[in-house]
């Protein structure tokens, strides 16, 4: 095959793959597919649909985010999730939301959403929002104090955090372009995994003594 034909075939393949690369969740093929969370069928990129006759009449509405969460936690924050597990009506629609409430000095620790881009608005108070670039972008920290009514954007897969820098309670609402964005809390992943990451791996990676690693593991033995 000549060079021009090879190039044409390659370009055609790229064009075919482009929609899949650009999309997050798969596009729906029906108006509604209320998730059957109790179904026995194997689910791939979504859940089986309930028959509409069994879906009820409230699957498009939720009041779950109307109530503040309890911030009496070790992190001083509370995350109220509204993904497909909590709102089955979002199944196949490629969207979900969270509400996060913060006590003064509370934090939403460094974490990653592996399957979604995040956009958020601060509803009350003021939050330091930090986004960490990847190594090929210089491992740069992008941060700003975001106040009530202001918004922020977090690209898919980048580590980020929020911290209440105000003297009063704060809250934010965020949305994702996935019904199940996933979350990886960095401290819990490193020091509370099951089974644990071997201590020598962490001592070498973090350049600390074994006693420091064991202390940190003890802090996360019970999870968050």
Curated annotation (Swiss-Prot):
Q: Where in the cell is it found?
A: Secreted, Extracellular space, Apoplast; Secreted, Cell wall
Which residue numbers delimit the Cupin type-1 domain?
A: 63-214
Disulfide bond entries:
33-49
Highest rank taxon of the organism: Eukaryota
- Please give an example of a GO cellular component term from this record: apoplast
| Residues spanning the signal sequence | 1-23
Q: In which tissues is it expressed?
A: Root.
A GO molecular function assigned to this protein is: oxalate oxidase activity
Does the entry feature the keyword Disulfide bond, yes or no?
Answer: yes
Pfam families on file? Cupin_1
Its post-translational modification remark reads:
Glycosylated. A form called G contains antennary GlcNAc residues, whereas a form called G' lacks antennary GlcNAc residues in its otherwise identical glycans.
Q: Which PANTHER family match?
A: GERMIN-LIKE PROTEIN SUBFAMILY 3 MEMBER 3
Protein name in UniProt: Oxalate oxidase 2
């Amino acid at each position: 095959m000549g060079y021009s034909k090879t190039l044409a075939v390659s370009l055609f393949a790229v064009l075919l793959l482009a929609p899949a690369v650009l999309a997050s969740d798969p596009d729906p093929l029906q108006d509604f597919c209320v998730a059957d969370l109790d179904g026995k069928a194997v689910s791939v990129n979504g859940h089986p649909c309930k028959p509409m006759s069994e879906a009820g009449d409230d699957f498009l509405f939720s009041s779950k985010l109307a109530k503040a969460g309890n911030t009496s936690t070790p992190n001083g924050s509370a995350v109220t999730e509204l993904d497909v597990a909590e709102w089955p009506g979002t199944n196949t629609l490629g969207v979900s939301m969270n509400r996060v409430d913060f006590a003064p000095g509370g934090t939403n620790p460094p974490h990653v959403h592996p399957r979604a881009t995040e956009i958020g608005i601060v509803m009350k108070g003021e939050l330091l929002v930090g986004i960490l670039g990847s190594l090929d972008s210089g491992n740069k920290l992008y941060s700003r104090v975001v106040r009530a009514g202001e918004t922020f954007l977090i690209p898919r897969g980048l580590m980020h955090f929020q911290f209440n820098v105000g003297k009063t309670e704060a809250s934010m609402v965020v949305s994702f372009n996935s019904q199940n964005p996933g979350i990886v809390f960095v401290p819990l992943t490193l020091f509370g995994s099951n089974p644990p990451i071997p201590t020598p791996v962490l001592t070498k990676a973090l350049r600390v003594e074994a006693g420091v690693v064991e202390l940190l593991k003890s802090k996360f033995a019970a999870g968050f």
